[in-house]
């Protein structure tokens, strides 16, 4: 079973439907024992870093995700806010995050060369694969994916980045370390390419 972590955020049902469409058995759950027992874990959703971490703490899931998922070498996928809270800290709400991957989360600038930059980024954007990773199997480089974000991850180790994009500035769009993989873009909203990445994660032999 694939556990979709329920921390009272949106988009969980969309991820479940995408997985079911692909033929994968999954469950939206906040049950720590079910998350520990799952063969893979997905942390998706939209929202603010501070509220996300508050909800995870209130549900008793912070250490479950740190110790029983990431540190236990269980395949772990973060999507959108899920990539951001994997890092140490976020400028949004000055939030202390999970610290699974060293780094921080920063906001897009309000302007570029004196011209206003519309934040959040909402829509399709080209993603460049910067490092070969099996999550991208069958997905051509420079494929467009769907983004909704005001903040983006900045890992301490540049080698953690596996994809990047541009929105006023160049930014990291996907990261991977061991069995932890995460994307800033929404797989469940990115059509066939997003479904392929989701399916790849579910089938990967790390």
Whereabouts are the PLM-identified features?
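Short acidic/histidine-rich motifs immediately flanking catalytic phosphotransfer sites
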Residues: 36-45
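Structural signature of beta-strand start/N-cap positions in the alpha/beta core
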Residues: 25, 40, 75-77, 144
């Amino acid at each position: 079973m694939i556990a979709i972590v329920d921390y009272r955020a949106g988009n969980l049902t969309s991820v479940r439907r995408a997985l079911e469409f692909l033929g994968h058995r999954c469950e939206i759950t906040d049950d720590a024992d079910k998350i520990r027992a799952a063969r893979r874990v997905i942390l998706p959703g939209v929202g603010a870093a501070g509220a996300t971490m508050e909800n995870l703490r209130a549900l008793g899931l912070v250490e479950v995700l740190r110790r029983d998922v990431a540190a236990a070498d269980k395949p772990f996928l973060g999507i959108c806010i899920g990539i951001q809270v994997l890092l140490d800290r976020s400028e949004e709400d000055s939030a202390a995050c999970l610290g699974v991957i060293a780094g921080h989360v920063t906001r897009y600038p309000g302007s570029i060369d004196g011209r206003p930059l519309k934040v959040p980024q909402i829509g399709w954007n080209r993603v460049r694969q910067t490092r070969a990773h099996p999550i991208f199997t069958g997905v051509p480089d420079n494929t467009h994916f769907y983004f909704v974000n005001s903040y983006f991850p900045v890992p301490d180790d540049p080698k953690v980045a596996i994809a990047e994009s541009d929105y006023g500035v160049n930014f990291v769009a996907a990261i991977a370390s061991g069995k932890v993989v995460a994307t800033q873009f929404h797989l469940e909203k990115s059509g066939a390419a997003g479904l392929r990445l989701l399916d790849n994660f579910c089938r990967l032999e790390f």
